[in-house]
């Protein structure tokens, strides 16, 4: 990787979370986020001038709350066509594909991954995603995979 990453785009379910949808007796939904991922997003990315963004196919108040907590202003929920949103973000931040990293876990992410210069995925991503990823985390989604990818991005840029 020789170009500077300016934008990290993340999927939620299966990437920032373990992909499970836990439901309470009254239909309330619970999601678990890894604190290490949060530190990487909230502290490490800004320190290196990298903008975090979330594009997810589902809509959830929980995700909105977590994004706010991590100061993620680029939150796009309910996006089944993630590519249009990705292209808008690239235009907004004046990024070429080489300036964009993407981490996701499933086939809906592949169309975006093919447009990014650096692609990562959790250890438990589907096979098609692992085949095109430049970085496969040792961690599963929701268990620090995003933090590992952030550390990889930063280390790669420091070595360049």
Kindly give the residue locations of the regions a language model identified.
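Alpha-helical substrate-recognition element adjacent to the catalytic core
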Residues: 1-81
């Amino acid at each position: 990787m020789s170009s500077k990453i300016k934008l990290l785009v993340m999927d939620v379910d299966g990437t920032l979370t373990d992909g499970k949808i836990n439901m309470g007796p009254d239909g309330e939904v619970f999601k678990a986020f890894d604190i290490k991922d949060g530190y990487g997003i909230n502290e490490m990315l800004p320190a290196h001038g990298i903008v975090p963004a979330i594009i997810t196919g589902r809509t959830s108040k929980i995700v909105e709350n977590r994004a706010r907590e991590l100061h993620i202003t680029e939150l796009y929920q309910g996006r089944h066509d993630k590519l249009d949103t990705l292209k808008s973000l690239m235009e907004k931040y004046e990024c070429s594909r080489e300036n964009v990293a993407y981490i996701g876990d499933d086939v809906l992410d592949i169309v975006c991954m093919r447009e990014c210069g650096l692609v990562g995925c959790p250890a438990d991503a589907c096979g098609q995603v692992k085949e095109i990823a430049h970085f496969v985390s040792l961690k599963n989604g929701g268990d620090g995979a995003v933090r590992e990818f952030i550390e990889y991005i930063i280390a790669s840029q420091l070595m360049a």
